[in-house]
Amino acid sequence: CFAAENTDIQSAENCKGFSETTRQISYPKGRDLREFFKWLAGVIDGDGNFDVRSVNSQLVLKAIRIKLHDRDIRILSYIQNTLHIGRVRSDKNKPHSIWIISKKEEMFYLINNINGLIRLKVPGLKKSCNYLGIDYKEANYNFGPYDPYFAGLVDTDGSIVFNYSGNRIECNLEFERNEFSSKLNFDNVIPNYKPAVSF
């Protein structure tokens, strides 16, 4: 849903058929990205990774990655086009693509903007904050109506299905139960509807 507003597809015919090019769209300076970073935190908690390694007995943040199936490459393009940082790399032997940032200043920028929004990949965020000299901020696990974080989780780890027997549309999220996921409270994300939780 985010990608459609921010990319433009052009088709061009050549001797072998048609090809499509996704063009980057620029945004006005001073654009407010707070809602975007909430959504991005959900995407990172879903399919992101803070690559923190031990180098010479010290923890080092090597990269921040988001790995998605190729069918979702527009999500990665949207992130790259909005932030104007990172690169998207495709795996030739597998149907996956990765958005990756590894420059220290880019990782510093991203961590500063998602600090206080990450709820599931907390250990990696804490180590990243420590490496970059940023004070870790704990996120609020109670979500308000239509929180973009929820959309980010659904975009990566969710599914929307039609339940024929119940005659309703369902949005499903599946988590590994741990100390962080057990604190998630989605009771107010969809007004007038409390989600069912099963273990």
Residue ranges, per PLM feature:
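Internal intein/HINT superfamily modules and their associated LAGLIDADG
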Residues: 1-199
